């Protein structure tokens, strides 16, 4: 059997594919779309291309929270600007002290070492064993949600 060469993909292949499907849905199923779905499509199409790309990249990842410094996509020249545009248009939101209820999922994007560093900044944080698991450390952090999030905002 002769192996076929793998075609070179455009750096924006996922964006091109998404827009192809989106165009098809708009053409074939416009009458089935809700007002909120139509608004989403219009708002998405009004975003700059790089912001659309970043949104698609984030939407295809498993996690709910992401650290900006961990986002690297060669086809997106200014991730910070794209994040700001996505935030301004309501496509994403940034962690705030109001997210203390979600602290466990937010801390999941940090390493155990980073969680220890955040916890160590709190004077009244309880003592814990050095061999504590990250999961247990995150549980210890939950009652200090707002303070932990404030510390996170200082380092981000």
Model segments located where?
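Basic helix-extension-helix modules of the SAP/HeH family
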Residues: 2-45, 53, 57-156
């Amino acid at each position: 059997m002769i192996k076929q060469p793998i075609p070179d993909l455009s750096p924006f292949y996922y964006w091109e594919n998404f827009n192809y499907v989106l165009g098809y849905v708009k053409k074939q199923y416009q009458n089935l779309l809700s007002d909120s779905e139509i608004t989403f499509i219009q708002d998405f199409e009004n975003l700059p291309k790089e912001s659309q790309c970043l949104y698609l990249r984030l939407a295809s990842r498993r996690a709910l929270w992401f650290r900006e410094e961990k986002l690297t996509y060669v086809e997106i020249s200014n991730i910070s600007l794209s994040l700001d545009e996505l935030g301004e248009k309501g496509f994403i939101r940034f962690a705030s002290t109001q997210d203390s209820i979600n602290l466990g999922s937010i801390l999941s994007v940090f390493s155990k070492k980073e969680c220890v560093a955040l916890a160590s900044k709190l004077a009244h944080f309880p003592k814990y064993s050095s061999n504590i698991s990250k999961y247990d450390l995150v549980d210890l952090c939950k009652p200090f949600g707002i303070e932990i999030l404030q510390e996170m905002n200082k380092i981000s």
